[in-house]
Amino acid sequence: LLNYLIPQTPKKLKVVFLYPREPKTSAWLYSHELGRMYLDETFSDKLETEYVAGVDENNVEQVLEDIIKAGADIIFCVGPQMMPNSLKVAVEHPEVYILNCSLNAPHPYIRTYYGRMYEAKFLAGMIAGAVTDNERVAYIADYPIYGMIANINAFALGVASVNPRAKVYLAWSKTKDYDRNKFLTENDLHYVSDQDIITPNDASRYFGLYKLQDGQALNLAMPIWNWGVFYEKLLQSVLAGSYKAEGQEQVKALNYWWGMSAGVIDLICSKHVPYGVKRL
């Protein structure tokens, strides 16, 4: 009788993030970790979150089984390498929502998600093409994987759209012979598009689009990932009961590929971008 008279506290959803390593050691993972913490603040009365680090293709099956047994309702696998083995677990546990952050093809049992960073890169390219003082712009990338090529192409198209004479010089920062200063000096490059995300342990100002001035980086624009916004929108659909409905009938597999219009991707300009350029 007391159970009917005393209001029951709704069960909180348990949301778990799986990372290949500790988020503070990776700029990419740290951006997702900020998103996880944003969820904690936004839905403190409706869900609880946690993360597990050190998850790869070799142990993801066991990790998934363990956290599902511990009560996980929604699981975000932040690593494309987790996709194949995660699928096996997802088929056996359709009651749990498992998503993979990648451009991998989605499956009826696992949805994938990513962001349209190329939209912000195109705009950053327009800025670079408008302000370059010698028709040269540098683009420093890390790995030629997933959306990276699309980002590079979008940036180059942005440059060309306002300055057809300008050239984009590309360097891969993870190659053995990479020498940042040598690359920039030998090619007389003053404007640089560099890494988009920094880690808590890295106070470098060499990120986003910047101008090299007296050996220092003068930051101009910064493409950003708003993973908190993405996770918030997705969790709202779960809480509203519309998540399952999205995958019914004609649509059997879903990919969430959101960009600037959804608020997942953005471009922040500093005061050093000329007013006329901002109006482009």
Question: PLM features: residue spans?
Answer:
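A residue-level marker of the well-folded mature domains of exported/periplasmic proteins
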Residues: 2-280
